Regions:
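Bacterial Sec-dependent N-terminal signal peptides
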Residues: 1-24
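Glycoside hydrolase catalytic-domain context in secreted enzymes
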Residues: 17-366
């Protein structure tokens, strides 16, 4: 009897496999193929110029895809408290859309005050739904910098002064965002705890302090939450800018923690071609904008990892080893988001999101 039941089960399984339609296109377009197989297949079809093209912005909030292969561009958006209104392609002015509203979610300091991981999951899920509805691939949040000085005007964006609490609350937020096919870009990595002269300040920190206070929430987001993206910060850590800081990005993040996602620069945070290429930056955003200001529309080709990168490869200054790693990470992000196998259309602002925002705010009033 058991043997007959086993054979029947096998037969049904084989029949189900045979009934599945055979995919007749390239592996990278097959939604049912493993992500890594899709990545390697797409990478093998790309030119050096196309790979380099993916590593820099093409507009204020998007980076390039590979149109020849049907691989879409990557769209970034602020968080972490609501989806940013659309802006013009090359300017910071709003585009004037009438369908780009968002729910105003509570500040993350309020979320942390709930001490409730279910609330954090609700927050991430809700904001992730709105990001996906607006066709955004990377949500620039959550922020988990530690509150170390009351003079930091962005303390409200973070989850407080306790590394333990921040580490517990960031995980469900990240998971909630990413189950919608949107990458949570955890920021600002790392030791970015003041706004005054943030682009020149040098945070001199010993290893014990770094690992016990400033990194636990980032580590939890990566290793427990499975974060798909990390944003580098404007400041220097021990004398090197953080958007291409070898110790932070190569040794700790991608080495010790095994992070397989993308590192995105804060807007205008990339300062040097060679360091960016060799020290772990994957997508360069906002260069020549001084972080917040306007820029010429043709400046994208002058980014540190744009034409200078391509020129350096042609001259033999750089190998394609680092480039292939960057392209793999970007492709992996695309196949996890806009080209993921399970389509997700998200939800526009709705009563459920209004209720979620109010419930989280009420729970955080302590």
């Amino acid at each position: 009897m058991k043997k007959a039941l086993f054979l029947s089960t096998v037969a049904l399984s084989l029949a189900a496999c045979c009934n599945q339609p055979k995919f007749d296109g390239p592996t990278y377009l097959n939604p049912n193929a493993p992500v890594e197989d899709r990545v390697e297949d797409a990478l093998a079809r790309m030119t050096t110029r196309e790979k380099v093209g993916m590593t820099t912005a093409q507009s204020k909030f998007s980076s390039r895809g590979v149109p020849r292969l049907g691989i879409p561009e990557v769209w970034h958006t602020d968080g972490p408290h609501g989806i940013r209104p659309e802006v013009l392609w090359d300017e910071w002015d709003q585009a004037g859309w009438t369908n780009d509203s968002c729910t105003a979610f509570p500040a993350l300091i309020n979320l942390a005050a709930t001490w409730d991981k279910e609330m954090s999951l609700l927050y991430g899920t809700s904001i992730g739904e709105e990001a996906r509805y607006r066709k955004k691939d990377i949500l620039l949040g959550p922020g988990v910098n530690i509150c170390r000085t009351p003079y930091n005007g962005r303390n409200f964006e973070y989850m407080g002064e306790d590394p333990f609490l921040s580490g517990k609350m960031v995980v469900p937020y990240v998971q909630g965002v990413q189950k919608n096919g949107v990458a949570a870009c955890v920021k600002h990595f790392a030791v970015n705890n003041q706004e005054f002269q943030r682009t020149q300040s040098n945070s001199v920190v010993d290893d014990r302090t770094l690992h016990e206070i400033y990194l636990p929430a980032f580590k939890a987001a990566v290793q427990e939450g499975g974060a798909w993206a990390i944003m580098g910060s404007y400041n220097l850590y021990n004398g090197q800018y953080n958007c291409h800081n070898k110790k932070l990005l190569v040794d700790i993040l991608k080495g010790d923690w095994g992070f397989d996602g993308v590192v995105v620069s804060d807007w205008g945070g990339c300062r040097d071609s060679e360091e960016a290429i060799k020290n772990g930056l994957d997508i360069e955003m906002g260069t020549w904008t001084n972080g917040l200001r306007g820029a010429a529309s043709d400046s994208y080709r002058n980014y540190h990892m744009a034409d200078p990168y391509l020129k350096g490869i042609k001259e033999g200054k750089y190998t394609t080893k680092e480039l292939d790693d960057k392209a793999r990470r970007i492709l992996r992000t695309i196949f996890r988001t806009s080209m993921r196998p399970e389509p997700n259309y998200g939800r526009f602002v709705c009563p459920e999101h209004y209720k979620a925002a109010r419930d989280i705010a009420a729970a955080g009033v302590v």
